[in-house]
Regions:
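Charge-rich, low-complexity N-terminal segments
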Residues: 1-92
Length: 92
């Protein structure tokens, strides 16, 4: 088994629904994420996947969707209504 791993960080805000404490209010974190790609064999170049291409594609997607975004729970109707018109990312 062959494997490559990409690790990166991004900053986002969120809040916890149905929580009795200060985390019920909007706040932010620096998140650390890891992506693993596995293969039983290597390609014709001797790679699982082009590491640079994969890293760039994942980082671009994260930057466009999660970095410096406010991540909303789909049940958070109060905040969703308050932010209507803004670009929203909903989590389930």
């Amino acid at each position: 088994m062959y494997q490559i791993r990409i690790e990166f960080t991004f900053d986002s805000g969120h809040r916890l629904l149905d929580y009795n404490g200060k985390c019920a209010y909007p706040h932010g974190h620096t998140y650390r994420a890891e992506v693993f790609i596995e293969s039983q064999s290597l390609n014709e170049l001797g790679l699982v996947y082009d590491f640079t291409d994969l890293k760039d594609r994942i980082k671009t997607w994260v930057d466009e969707n999660w970095d410096h975004a406010f991540l909303l729970n789909s049940r958070d109707s109060e905040l969703i209504e308050g932010l209507s018109g803004a670009k929203l990312v909903r989590l389930h």
